Amino acid sequence: KIRANFIAIFDNDAEGYSSKCSLLNEIKNWPANFRILLYPEITMFHKYPTIAPNGKIVPDDINKKAASIELYLPDSIIKTGGNYYPIEWESRKRIRNKNNVEEALYQGVISYKDDIKHKFHEMRNKIERGDEVFKTEEWKNMKKLLETIVFAFNNEQ
């Protein structure tokens, strides 16, 4: 028996949501020291740019569909030319939610992941060298994600 608190946290995308729902459906009664979570919903994710099948950029709610950890990075990392890197839709998943009702959601990924990784490493290196100031307000979404973990046992889930 695990006595310490245990947290499983998944991306706020279709894969993560599917994994969370599978666990909740498989095991109905979790011990009080376990939490099964998704990364938090962020307001801007309700109308985030996505690439429609016709190639046009359209806003869509990417919660439970495409909000991977990269989306929680500062805007300066996930934007280019003043615009957010759009989400590319990949596959459609059938998911049984925690009420055992089937949902169909598309799994999406942020475009230009390699560029985002490069920009993140570049920012980190500049901050470490003292060439750039760490601005707490730029990391508000990552802070919210970390608070989801840190405070997971403060509220009943």
State what each model feature region is.
Residues K1-I2:
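Short, surface-exposed loop/strand segments
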